[in-house]
Every structure is written in structure tokens, then in C-alpha cells.
Amino acid sequence: MKESIFSKKRILLLGSGELGKELVIESKRLGLEVIAIDRYEKAPAMQVADYSRVIEMGDKNILKNVIKEFKPDYVVPEIEALSIEALKELEDEGFNIVPNARTVEITMNRDKIRDLASKDLKIKTAKFDYIFEFDDLEKKADEIGFPLLLKPLMSSSGKGQSLVETKNDLQNAWKQAQANSRGKVKGVIIEEFINFDFEFTLLTVRKENGENIFCLPIGHLQSNGDYQCSWQPLEIKESLIIEAKRMTSRILNNLNGAGLYGVEFFIKGSEVIFSELSPRPHDTGMVTLVSQNINEFELHLRAFLNLPIPRIDLIEPSATRVILSNQEYLNPIYEGLYEALEFEKTKVLIFGKPVSRKGRRMGVVLSSNTDINLARKNADEAALKIKVSTT
């Protein structure tokens, strides 16, 4: 008989942002104990966790010590900026890293996941190369062709990503990528710009027995690589979804760790082009909080806890739109909440970040409707009602 009592299971969350906050909430519903770790105080997930700690997660010894102190049953990374050496050593010592240390390492570095997909598994991607010195950039840019994309090898939420139109833009794009690179890696990936028709996320649950379960595709729009809105379901040809599932299965069969994965694709004509993969709940997947009978955070938990995952159903077509700050505030407040909640079947999530910055994601609006276009319209208009401010 499978173990069914989880009240004494302990999860240590590495990174405590808005996605981590929702994961903690779902963990508490299952009776789990959660420790939330981040590099700053009062991070969103810390506000709902049992315990929290502020540390430098990129320091191997500090990270190992705090994990050994709390002795969690599961170590669950939510971000890329952490010491992979610590996780690999702890896994060798018997700690359970979700989904596993190898997958965390491959997906936190754009070069490793791109090499796995393109070179090892022969999956179609944009043309790309890696540059570690600015002097090599101009020559490689001529080979790739303009416009092109320049990204840090390690970053999150699109930070440091630039669309480079001409040679004159290379210097500034290089500086931007260097300034926003996480960890010790200072190289960049130079990438062909694909004038795609649309992009989407395929949330995929990998079970311990190796089965892959797919959610309905999620459409999304980005600005400078950062998610702005999403909607589910996305209208897309069945043949394209079949190919995306095939590509996803090939990658996950190689990574082979239980959990939820956010897999991003471009569509150009009849081509399916692999973009990126995250081994954890995905920002575009926040729409599943209202669109699905089992949201992405609960799916992640069920997968790595080896709990049953029944059929994933669409409750109703739904959409999201982020709430952005236009400047820096300490202890920000939110105006227009009343007006935003006047929209039918609409919810507002305020993440609770202690400091706002220009362009920082501070919350999200979720809206449902039998008409997906109306759900998107309501989410967009409700988000415009909310202004981040200060007293």
C-alpha cells in the first residue's frame, strides 16, 4: 500500500518568489512543512512558509550547511541562481533534489540545455553559438545575421536579453548581458532571431514511472524575454501539438526526473522549434490556478511526492495579465483593486514583494470566460486598473 500520510514530510524551497509562494500554499494544503530560502527578507514564499532563512545560495558551503541543518525530505529549487556543486554533493550524500541535480544543472545553463536538445537529441532549435569575449561577437553576429538575440548563459525572467538590430547595438547588448548574468558564468548565447507566428508553453508532468502527462497548450506573449500575459487553451493545429509532445518526451526521457516542466516552443508555419525548458512551475502556467482542475503547483508536488495524478481537465478558458511597477517603492501599495475585481470571474494575486522596481512583476490578474478572447480582454483591462504606488 502506498504511503498516504505526508504531515511529517519537509520541503526546503530554494528561491521564494511568487511561484514559490503558490507552491508553499499547495504544500500546506497537503500538510507538508516548508522552509523558504532566498537572498532577501520577506520574499513572497517566506510569508506563507513555516520557516525561512536569508542566505547567499550561490555559496556552496553556506547552501550545504543550511540544507543539512533543516534535513528536508525534498530540496526544491525555484530559481537558477544557486550552487549546483552543493546540490550535486548533497544528492550524492542521499538528499532528494527535485527533479534531480543533473536536470537542475542542465536547465540553469542555456548552453547545456541547448546542446542537449540540438546536438545530442537533434531537436530543432534556432541557430546559436556561445561567445565569451566581445572581440569574437562581431564576427559571429555576421554569421548568424541581423536581427539576432543576445542572452546571458545564465539568467531568469528574460533579464539581460536583447534584440540586436545592427552591429552598432552589439556593445550595449553585450554589457546588458554581462550585467544581468547570474552565477560565475559570464558568457553569452548569440541566437538567430526567429520571426515566429506565435510561441507557447507545454506544461508537462513527469511521473516517477517515466510517464509524461501533458496539459493543454498555453499561449503567451513576452517583452524582452519576460512573460506579460498567458491564456489556456491555445488554438493550435493538432499536428503541431503532436510534434511538440514528441520533442518534449525525448528531452524528459533524457533528464528523467519526476516533477512538472514548463517547455517553451516557437511555431513558424508548420515548424515546431524548441526554445527553453524549466524543471519547475512556469510563470505562464499561473493561468492554471483558475483554468485547470489541478493547477501546476499541485501537479509538481504530486509528481515528486509520487501521489496519484488523475485526468487533468480544463475548468474554463482563462487568461492572465501581469501587474508591473513603473518605479521603485519600499513597501508598495496597490490602487485600483476594487475596480479590477468588478470584472466577472476575475481574481487578483498580489505577490507581496517588499520592494518594487521599474518593470518588476508585482502581481497578476486571472480571468475566466467561456470565450477565451473575452477572458483575455478582461484580464488585460483589469490589470490596467491596478497601479503600484506608495503612501
UniProtKB/Swiss-Prot annotation:
> Carries keyword Cell membrane?
no
Q: What residues does Mg(2+) bind to?
A: E264, E276
Name the GO cellular-component terms. Answer: cytosol
Signal peptide region? none
Q: Name one GO biological process term.
A: 'de novo' IMP biosynthetic process
Please give the catalytic activity noted in the UniProt record: N(1)-(5-phospho-beta-D-ribosyl)glycinamide + formate + ATP = N(2)-formyl-N(1)-(5-phospho-beta-D-ribosyl)glycinamide + ADP + phosphate + H(+)
Pathway recorded for this protein = Purine metabolism; IMP biosynthesis via de novo pathway; N(2)-formyl-N(1)-(5-phospho-D-ribosyl)glycinamide from N(1)-(5-phospho-D-ribosyl)glycinamide (formate route): step 1/1
EC number(s): the record gives: 6.3.1.21
InterPro entries from the xrefs?
Answer: ATP-grasp, ATP-grasp_carboxylate-amine, ATP_grasp_subdomain_1, PreATP-grasp_dom_sf, PurT, PurT/PurK_preATP-grasp, PurT_C, Rudment_hybrid_motif
Q: Which residues bind N(1)-(5-phospho-beta-D-ribosyl)glycinamide?
A: E18, L19, E78, D283, K353, R360, R361
Q: What class of enzyme is it?
A: ligase
Pfam families according to UniProt: ATP-grasp (PF02222), PurT_C (PF21244), RS_preATP-grasp-like (PF22660)
Summary of the function given for this chain in its UniProt record: Involved in the de novo purine biosynthesis. Catalyzes the transfer of formate to 5-phospho-ribosyl-glycinamide (GAR), producing 5-phospho-ribosyl-N-formylglycinamide (FGAR). Formate is provided by PurU via hydrolysis of 10-formyl-tetrahydrofolate.
Q: Which family does it belong to?
A: Belongs to the PurK/PurT family.
* Quaternary structure and partners: Homodimer.
Q: What protein is this chain from?
A: Formate-dependent phosphoribosylglycinamide formyltransferase
Please give the organism: Prochlorococcus marinus (strain AS9601)
